[in-house]
Amino acid sequence: AYHDWMRKNRTWKDGTYFSSGWGCGMDNIPRMDTTRYSAEFHHGFISFVDVTMQQIFNAKNLLAIADLAGIARDKSLEDEIAALEKIANEKMWDEATGLYHDLDREGNRVSVRHIGGFWALLARVAPPERARRLASSLADGATFASPCGTRSLAKGEDGYERDGGNYWRGGVWCITDWAIVRGLAGCGLYEDAHKLAMRHVCAVAKVYADTGTVWESYDPEKVTHGKLYGQSVRRDFVGFSGVTPIAMLVRDVFGMEFTPGKVVWRVRLLERHGIENLTLPDGNVVSLICEKRSSLSEKPVIKVLSDKPFKVEVK
């Protein structure tokens, strides 16, 4: 129902989606002419690359749910995916920047480089060679890579604020780094996902050690919490920032992916690491520990305890 509502009420004639800063969650990102339109409350007459990618992702998930439930696929969703992927890869992609961009009302790419284009990874819109270019941008300290993770606005863009990030004018957000890391892994770029996750998780952990809390956003230039209008963002913000020290730590730093009756473990760390007394959805209580290694070439030694049998695949 929500997907249909968005399709009926938040699309342009070509089927691409629009929103506002508050609507898309990136409150004050300067993606439009802010001398004419409110970044927070207006669509600026542009096609939002992030919302368009999210709707592709949502449509694909709805089709997957239909398959699991054994019900007929909605052909309109299949048609929408095909149409939007065509626009994304023919119009939103910029070969010069190696990024996906918003489109203006004439169908031209908006030059502002922001984090929204990386939703192409999670939505599986980017072909392999473009996914690799996106991964390169994510590792580039001159644009998106920061000590805390991924800048919401590329360094050097008009409106970028190096001191605290001023929310979405450069600030690093756990929720967007989670989407990006999961997107990289979904595209098979596990090493890139692990490296970004390590940088982000370690930064969030360091700030927690320094301040005793998890923050709403993080600084784009140094390892500390973010700011909004010169003041600290909200502390104790586990509501979505908790995804980093929990889910990202387990899945992309430790490298554990849990499926029913099975754990796939992509071991990347040299330190002794793992989880003890984890209750799986089927009630099985497991402990998985990888012992310390001296090098990446050394074969991992893994100890597993569980209440009942399950499979562990080590990669």
What are these regions (language model features)?
Residues 129-143, 194-201, 256-273:
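Short alpha-helical "patches" and their helix-cap loops
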Residues 1-12, 54, 61-64, 79-94, ...:
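Alpha-helical scaffold segments in carbohydrate-active enzymes
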Residues 31-69, 74-89:
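Internal metal/ion-chelating core segments
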